[in-house]
Design a protein with these regions (language model features):
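Membrane-embedded helical hairpins/re-entrant loop segments and their flanking transmembrane helices
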Residues: 7-36
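Transmembrane alpha-helical segments and their short flanking loops
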Residues: 1, 10-12, 30, 44-143
Length: 143
């Protein structure tokens, strides 16, 4: 619930609202339907998040933050423990609620989502600039 799934949605948010590169924005639009249901392969292989330092580092930071906050929230009684297994393809906030049967899990999920977006912004801006330079090189070679 609170691991990498939130980070992928933060990447998706940044692709659609922070990045200006045409390729990244179109990837962001194309990945929305599948990412809503936790199918993140378009992002994993399209951005890519594997072997790309500008997406790998913030992903690991976000996973650490998400897991620590979720654990501490559960330990402190801010949300209930996970009490049931639900299908992984449910939209993430609904997954958080149904697996804990606690509305506070949704609140914590959205707080973590906002934190993940903030963590990713500088990295995605750098990646956006890198993609722009790549596009310039490709257009120069084509001329």
């Amino acid at each position: 619930i609170f691991g990498l799934a939130i980070a992928y949605l933060a990447i998706l948010f940044n692709l659609n609202f922070v990045c200006k590169n045409k390729r990244l924005r179109s990837l962001g639009r194309l990945a929305i339907p599948s990412s809503v249901f936790n199918i993140n392969e378009p992002l994993v292989f399209g951005v890519p998040t594997v072997l790309n330092i500008l997406t790998f580092i913030p992903s690991m930071i976000c996973v650490a933050i998400n897991l620590v906050v979720a654990y501490l929230s559960t330990a402190a009684g801010l949300m209930s423990k996970t009490c049931m297994s639900v299908p992984w393809t449910l939209p993430a906030p609904l997954y958080a609620f149904l697996s804990t049967m606690d509305y506070r899990a949704i609140i914590i999920w959205f707080v973590l989502f906002a934190i993940n977006i903030i963590v990713f912004i500088p990295f995605m801006k750098s990646y956006d600039k890198q993609m722009d330079l790549e596009d310039e090189k490709l257009s120069e070679q084509g001329e």
